[in-house]
Amino acid sequence: MTYHFSGMDELLHEAFTRFSGTIVAVFEERLGAAGSPDEAREAVADLVHHLSGGNQRELILTHELYTLAARRPAYRELTRTWMSRSRRALEWHFDPATARQLDALIEGLSIHRALETEPHERALTVEAIARITAPHA
């Protein structure tokens, strides 16, 4: 460890940096494949259900990173960068305010689905996305 990293904290920070990069890559892959607004909305629903699809490792790592970010500025910066990159991918299809709302929706619904004993159905996710992305008069 000491050959590549100055200590455990540097190793941990690098591991969380790589982890957050893998999640952003999923966002970029799903949203990059969308060619229309409807496909982009479906991609957002796919993200919610993919991220909450039973991979406890990702859920645990995400929450451990959030805990560190709440306590330590270096990890807060890492999560800020992660959110910024996720929103940029959403902005390929949605305006910045909508992208920010969708990013929070993805996060919240993913956490709720992962922790519920009976996760909500895709229809609820699709309806929430439609409400956020509906044209406003």
Predicted feature descriptions by range:
Residues 4-28:
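An amphipathic alpha-helix adjacent to DNA-recognition modules
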Residues 27, 31, 69-73, 109-114:
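Short amphipathic alpha-helical interaction patches enriched in hydrophobic/aromatic residues
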Residues 47-48, 62-66, 102, 106-109:
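Short alpha-helical scaffolding segments that buttress acidic/His motifs in well-ordered protein cores
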